[in-house]
Every structure is written in C-alpha cells, then in structure tokens.
C-alpha cells in the first residue's frame, strides 16, 4: 500500500497561529509557471502567483514526516487537550466488549499494536468545544479552523468574516460543529457549518461479503487524498472493532460511525435482541477508540413508523429500518429516544458530536417531502436542543431522493425546525432513473442544497444502490462531490473561493497546460485525457484543433487590437 500522497508541482506548507503560535495549519501550495507575452518582437515574462489549496491529506503529503501505518499518525492535538487540564487518562478500557476483544488472543494478527489508554473528562468538567465556546474560550482548534478556512486570504488582500472569535460564536450558538474526540488527537481540526466552506463526507466500510482491513485503510487514505473532509466507517462485516482502530489511528480527518450497526452485529443480526445496555457499551467502546461523531436514529418514534407505509419505497435507511422494526416488535418507544439524554451524557465526556440520523428519509423522488420525513424532522428539532443543553455538538442528517423543485423546502424547514443546526445531506438525488450514474444525479441536488445552506454533503459513488464501492469508486465519488461543494462555495461567496477558478481560467486562456492540470481537482485524470490526445503543449487541444480554437483566436484578436 502506498503510504505517501503526492501532487504534481505542489508543496506542503504551514501557516502559524497568532493566538496560539505553536499551531501549524497544513495546506497545499501550487506554483504556477510564468505567463509569456510579446510586445512587438520583445518577449515579456510575467510571474503568476502561487495558489493555496485546502488540504485534507494530513501528514501523508508531508515528506518530512515519517509514516508508519503500524504506529499511526502523529498525535497532533494531544498536547492541546492535556494543557486544558480537564481530562484524565483511564487505567483501562471502560467497555466490556472492548476488553473482551483486547483479551482475545486469536485476534492478535489483526490488532493495531500501539493502542494508548483512552482519555475521559474529569468529574464535573465540561470538555466539549461547545462548552468552551459558551464560556467565551477560543481553543487552539478554533483558531486552527479559522486559519484553514481562510488559507492565504490575508496575503491576497481578500476580506474575510472568519476569525477565531467568529468560529467560537458559531459553535456556541450551535450553527457549526467542530468534531474532535479527545481520543482522536491525530485528526486535524475542521468545521461544519453553513457560514464556512461546504464539506463532504466519504463513506467506507466492509460488509459481510467483501473487503479487508487493509482495503478499508487504503480507501480512507484515498479519500483524504482527493479531498474528503470527514470519513464514515459503515462496516457491517467481521472484525468491526479492529478495522475501526486501524482507520482512526491513521486518519487525519474526523471519523464517524453508526453504532447501531455494530450493536446489531453483536446480537447476530436479531433486531429484537437489541438492548439499551448493549448499545450503551457500544457507544463507550467507540468513544474510547476515538470516533468523532455518531449517526444516531433517535428521531424514529413509535407513533410515526406507520407513516412510511404509504410510500413507494418504504424505509430505506438501514438504521431507520432497524429501529422501526425494534419499535414494532416491542410495541414501545425506541431506546435511542428514551435514553437520548443518557447518550448525550456519554458523548459529552469525550467530545463526540451527534449526527441525528434521518431514518425516515425518502428513498425515491416519489416519497420526497412526505409526512413521515417531516415528522422525524420535527423530533430532530427537539433532540438537537436537548443535545445542546448537555454541551454536545449536533447536526442534522437529511435526504435522500428529492426532485429539484422540492429541495428548497427541505432547507427552509430544517432551518426553522432545527434552530439553524448544521444540515448534512445525502445528495439529494434528483432523479431515480440512473443506476451507475447516481454520483451525478446526486451531485446536481448536492450543489443546489449546498448553495441554499447545507453544511456538509455525503458523497455518492457510481455504485450507489448496486455494490460496495472500491478504491476507484471512492475517487470518483469524492471528486464529484468536491465539484458540488465548490460550486456551492462560489455561489455563497465564500472568501477566496474564486481564486483557484480564476487562476485555472487564466492558465487555460494562456495555454499553460501544466498549470491547468496542477490546479484541477484531479490532476492525474486531466493529464491522462490530455496525453491521450497525442499532441504536445501547443496552443490548442484535439477538441478544436489549431484553426477552430476560440481562445487562440481571441488572443490573436487582442494582439491585433493592441498593435493598432
């Protein structure tokens, strides 16, 4: 497995903090070649400025940092966490299941060896980023994300509203989430909120029939290379605990999970055997491994399950179907809803955020914006307030399959019912007729809802509805969603969002091919298509040829006008 991430003519650079000078925020600097023009017979060379690019590749792209997947990434945030004096290291793992896996000698060949004992909040201490923000405290993590969001706007003279204090205010008010489990110090701080860059999430994970630990770690690295801002491990197959440990220890972005999946695996797939006690132990197990946010389908209510019966496609969420069946079998309220305050008490001890899962999201455009979907959204609005009361950061998951004319209503209702908590949507897919191309059908909806205010977009791969995605599918899904997210950032007017577009457009106009490749979302793919055209670095491509290139003719026209 390749353990280095490389981009052509790019350099890993770091910007330092002002409040916390020890902070070093990594980003990618792309050097451009100079522009060449002629004034009469005189050749004029004009330098082009470097371009800074938001970078999710972490230490993997820094040639000065030694990478050893068996030891994990550097523990970037550990010193910041300990300096606050609010946490303690536990003498052993708290989870009964975690101890059982640790003591099982048959798993030694699968195990990540360098496991540190977990941290937890000291008694009576409030350690979440939201708790600090409410107290008026700007943490190193908050300054880190402010620098990261702005990149080199200051150098370029671009005004920006994003300061460490602005970050603090957004977190305190619940409008943004900074997912940062104290047991995942390897993660570089990032922020999810409508007043920041639109983020994308990548789903990976094994199933009962496919994939290995090595493959999932490779997918995680691959996602980070192409720009995945967060990563969800949705493993449902064997050795979920061990797979997750390897991923977290080698992941520079926040990691999320759906704990009910592992809980169901522990009872051999028998939904009726799920209990609060089992689920609670699973939460603690994953908190102490370092999961940064949990999708929890606590919005499923016993009295709302029947609303999905009217649908064309019923309930399509795995977590939603599990909890709906549990409610019906036991004829009672979901234990996730009944114990939501207890869940938040656990999460607050580790600073784990809650992503309120949309278990009743529509699985077809026919079912979009129906009574079942919006009944669950109402419950989410109640739950997000309860999470905030416990100082737990929270965001709201959304659809799904929604035709374009119904997208705006989703965003407006979510803002109204969920008190401006960040929205996190799966697409939405705007049509149902394109299996094999659902990364495109969903990116259309994702760009629109991102522009309207959704904070994070969950990627969709070409294999959606068809098969488990492989490494190449991850690449296509991430790039497709980076397009959607960036399109939304441009429409929102995010500070500095236009810089990269302008640089690439200028390079295109001047036929600086290498700069076009290097500034693109996927330099390798762009170069491969260009190279396949079998031509040199001339002032045209095989699309138009030398006589029909509009940009070449436009440049000639401009040159003629100057001479006159």
From Swiss-Prot:
A Gene Ontology molecular function term of the record: 4 iron, 4 sulfur cluster binding
Keywords of the record: 4Fe-4S, Iron, Iron-sulfur, Lyase, Metal-binding, S-adenosyl-L-methionine, Thiamine biosynthesis, Zinc
E.C. designation(s): 4.1.99.17
Leading EC class: lyase
InterPro entries xrefs: ThiC (IPR037509), ThiC-associated_dom (IPR025747), ThiC/Bza_core_dom (IPR038521), ThiC/BzaA/B (IPR002817)
Pfam families per record: ThiC-associated, ThiC_Rad_SAM
Cofactor note: Binds 1 [4Fe-4S] cluster per subunit. The cluster is coordinated with 3 cysteines and an exchangeable S-adenosyl-L-methionine.
Cofactor(s) the protein needs: [4Fe-4S] cluster
Iron-sulfur keyword on record: yes
Catalysis: reaction(s): 5-amino-1-(5-phospho-beta-D-ribosyl)imidazole + S-adenosyl-L-methionine = 4-amino-2-methyl-5-(phosphooxymethyl)pyrimidine + CO + 5'-deoxyadenosine + formate + L-methionine + 3 H(+)
CC terms in the record's Gene Ontology section: cytosol
Residues engaged in binding [4Fe-4S] cluster: 541, 544, 549
Pathway(s) of this molecule: Cofactor biosynthesis; thiamine diphosphate biosynthesis
Residues that, per the record, bind Zn(2+): 401, 465
Residues binding substrate: 203, 232, 261, 297, 317-319, 358-361, 397, 424
One Gene Ontology biological process: thiamine biosynthetic process
PANTHER family assigned to the protein according to its UniProt record, in alphabetical order: PHOSPHOMETHYLPYRIMIDINE SYNTHASE, CHLOROPLASTIC (PTHR30557:SF1), THIAMINE BIOSYNTHESIS PROTEIN THIC (PTHR30557)
Function comment: Catalyzes the synthesis of the hydroxymethylpyrimidine phosphate (HMP-P) moiety of thiamine from aminoimidazole ribotide (AIR) in a radical S-adenosyl-L-methionine (SAM)-dependent reaction.
NCBIfam families: PRK09284.1, PRK13352.1, thiC
Family in the record: Belongs to the ThiC family.
UniProt-recorded name of the protein: Phosphomethylpyrimidine synthase
Organism whose genome encodes this protein: Bacteroides fragilis (strain ATCC 25285 / DSM 2151 / CCUG 4856 / JCM 11019 / LMG 10263 / NCTC 9343 / Onslow / VPI 2553 / EN-2)
Gene it is expressed from: thiC
């Amino acid at each position: 497995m390749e353990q280095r991430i490389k981009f052509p003519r790019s350099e890993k650079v770091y910007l330092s903090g002002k409040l916390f000078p020890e902070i070093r925020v990594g980003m990618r600097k792309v050097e451009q070649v100079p522009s060449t023009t002629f004034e009469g017979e005189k050749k004029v060379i004009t330098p082009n400025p470097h371009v800074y690019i938001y970078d999710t590749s972490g230490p993997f792209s820094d040639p000065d940092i030694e990478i050893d997947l068996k030891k994990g990434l550097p523990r970037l945030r550990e010193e910041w966490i300990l300096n606050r004096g609010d946490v303690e290291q536990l003498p052993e793992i708290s989870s009964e299941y975690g101890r059982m896996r640790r003591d099982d000698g048959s798993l030694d060949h699968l195990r990540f060896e360098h496991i540190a004992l977990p941290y937890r909040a000291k008694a009576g201490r409030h350690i979440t980023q939201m708790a600090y923000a409410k107290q008026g405290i700007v943490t190193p993590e908050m300054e880190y994300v402010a620098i990261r969001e702005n990149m080199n706007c200051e150098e370029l003279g671009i005004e920006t509203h994003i300061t460490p204090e602005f970050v603090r205010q957004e977190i305190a008010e619940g409008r943004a989430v900074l997912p940062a489990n104290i047991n995942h110090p390897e993660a570089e701080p990032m922020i999810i909120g409508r007043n920041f860059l639109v983020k994308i999430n990548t789903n990976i994970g094994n199933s009962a029939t496919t994939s290995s630990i090595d493959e999932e770690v490779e997918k995680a690295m691959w996602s980070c290379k192409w720009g995945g801002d967060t990563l969800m491990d949705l493993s449902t197959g064997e050795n979920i605990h061990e797979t997750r440990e390897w991923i977290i220890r080698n992941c520079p972005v926040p990691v999320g999970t759906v704990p009910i999946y592992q809980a169901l695996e522990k009872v051999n797939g028998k939904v009726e055997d799920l209990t609060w006690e089992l689920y609670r132990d699973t939460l603690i197990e994953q908190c102490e491994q370092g999961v940064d946010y949990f999708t929890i389908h606590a919005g499923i209510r016993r009295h709302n399950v029947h609303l999905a019966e009217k649908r064309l496609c019923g309930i399509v969420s795995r977590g939603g179907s599990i909890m709906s069946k549990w409610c019906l079998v036991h004829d009672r309220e979901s234990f996730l809803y009944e114990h939501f305050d207890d869940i938040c008490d656990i999460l607050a001890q580790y600073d784990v955020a809650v992503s309120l899962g949309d278990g009743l999201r529509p699985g077809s455009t026919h079912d979009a914006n129906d009574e079942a979907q919006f009944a669950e959204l109402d419950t989410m609005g109640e739950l997000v307030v309860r999470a905030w009361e416990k100082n737990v950061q929270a965001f709201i998951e959304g659809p799904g399959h929604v035709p374009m004319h119904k997208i705006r209503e989703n965003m407006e209702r979510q803002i109204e019912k969920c008190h401006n908590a960040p929205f996190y949507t799966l697409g939405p897919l705007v049509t149902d007729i394109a299996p094999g191309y659902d990364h495109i059908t969903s990116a259309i909806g994702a760009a629109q809802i991102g522009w309207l205010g959704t904070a994070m977009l969950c990627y969709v791969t070409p294999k959606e509805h068809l098969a488990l995605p492989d490494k190449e599918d991850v690449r296509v899904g991430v790039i497709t969603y980076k397009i959607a997210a960036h399109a939304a950032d441009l429409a929102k007017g995010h500070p500095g969002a236009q810089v990269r577009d302008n640089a690439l457009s200028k390079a295109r106009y001047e036929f600086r091919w290498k700069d076009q490749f290097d500034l693109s979302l996927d330099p390798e793919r762009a170069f491969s298509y260009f190279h396949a055209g079998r031509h040199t670095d001339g002032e045209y491509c095989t699309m138009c040829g030398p006589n029909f290139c509009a940009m070449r003719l436009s440049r000639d026209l401009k040159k003629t006008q100057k001479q006159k």
